[in-house]
């Protein structure tokens, strides 16, 4: 008799008993229902909190227009178009800046079918589509492991509405990964069990293009998955099968490398990698609460991404730490664990648990990124869903005792609510260490209620032929209720700051047409993130992790923090002149605060479209020359607080470049490195303005400038340095000099000069060749096996 949970030949799509489309429909309907209340409240412009509001809505709307050429004009100098985004921080290559977020996502490319103005209103329909696709993929994967296809439907719903997926609505593009991953695992199973060819290569390519960062973790997980299944002899491995699987892996990687090579070259310049001198940090987390949070995240529903119910220490917020299965928690998976010996699913989940608890192993899912994340949990969640439905389908499995055990573990967390605490300052005593008691009660209540309903259904209906369908209905109802509460906590928890988001975003579209003409940067004061993207202007305030890597060296050198956002303080006035900021935008409500905080260099310009606009009287047009230079060694010996002032006076060259280009400038005397006051800054701006380009035009592949010089000199542009840029002076290619620890300059002769900077992602030629070659090989490979299959059938 065949064991429950072992692999078998699945039903094929289109067969009478197949329920693929039913699963897709159920997942889509459930997602639509729990988004519906918020969709109505927001009038169709759904906004949530944090990253969703600041990044995802802005990115989707902006990139829809950018890809269609709705932003800056094409360059007249080159045939290269739509490669450089000025609205991304100080300017960034669009492919590298958005590959992590959406550039390779099939859902984003599908959204291009709709007008740019529709995108804020399509965020919910796109999320519903992602949930539907996730359900379909999970069903395809799970149907191999069940006897009754209804359990595959149930497992797909468990995966699709897991705590991980619902939590990551906050990040939006993470749901893309959740949606596409099951197809990758399904195609691997097809190759291992059925010797089915070409699908694995295809889904490797799709997942790699979709998100290169998450794909690293998928490679690690697939290795764990393959080794664990091989160790339990779930499939017969031959040299031929292994060779073809390796070939398809490489072929898929080649087809999906269109974004990979440029992204890798960009990441190598990004300082957010692991500290290889960590020592104990490799093996243990520094806070005990981190371990408790990890363990609890596998059994209890998740907190809101930016609110913790219990934890006061450790890295918890925004980490996507949840492996919770709706209604069931780990009850079914633990029941399966107890019932099976030497099972591959147990080994996969056990290995993943070890990886979760060891920092260096956890970071392996993210190429040894130094920041803690749990954004790979969706992969073991799919296996946990399989274990759960296998336990439910096997009538010999004890389901009740694991459910009781998980319930008691949940109840044990009440200790955090009643433990006595003495205030170190007053000496008074109180009860509980909860950070958000209300959210904790909601999470605990849903966790216990889910297990109570789970036990009731198992006891009453387990022997019924419709047990799987009843459990599916309960899971979907539970997922609906919890998702509404979870999203509501996150959404309305920031309502006091986000209630005017839609108004500010839509007003920014009006202001875009009312701002004075010209190519300049803007700044904002105490308004919502990424307004610059709605204005289609380079803005000093930008929230995004993957801007040009040189920005991550330029800002810290000035004492300006740059991790996932750029937000130089208003007090750093000299940055505004250096970076060619001409206008600052705030709201009428914040005008008084701004005027009290700002320096004398701002004058009121006008109020329109719900905004107040100020003009920078120390504005310097982009593209100007210097009289003085400073070596990087000398620059790093100065005080960070006044370095921006210093950069208005002198160009900073590396010691090597100073030996080559120093002859065109005068070495800044030591005495002039200290006179760094506002008055001297105004004079420096006046001098730089006198040498500025007469023409500066931004375009969607870089920029064009025209400048007249009295002598041969370096011309400075406050544009982030990137290996993808090629400079042309008077039509001739010229070397680009990295200056000021992250910006650019180019040497120009005396007289009139026409300068063009053209951007193409570094490595794009190689990645295109790999992708096109891979596609040709894949088509031939697929055609061969299709031909062989037809010939075999005829025989």
Model-flagged regions — what are they?
Residues 1-40, 244, 452, 466-476, ...:
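Start-transfer (signal-anchor) and selected internal transmembrane alpha helices
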Residues 5, 10, 14-16, 665-795:
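Active-site-proximal, structured, solvent-exposed surfaces of multi-pass membrane proteins
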Residues 27, 131-144, 150-231, 244-264, ...:
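Membrane-embedded helix bundles of polyisoprenyl
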Residues 37-145, 150-182, 206-210, 293, ...:
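Active-site lumenal/periplasmic loops and adjacent helix-entry segments of GT-C-fold
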Residues 53-57, 61-76, 106, 241-242, ...:
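Periplasmic/ER-lumenal interhelical loops and adjacent helix-loop junctions
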Residues 113, 471-713, 717-725, 730-734:
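Soluble catalytic regions of membrane-associated enzymes that act on cell-envelope
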Residues 134-141, 180-192, 220-228, 330-336, ...:
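Transmembrane alpha-helical segments
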Residues 194-195, 214, 345-504, 752-795:
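Contiguous transmembrane helix-bundle modules in multi-pass membrane proteins
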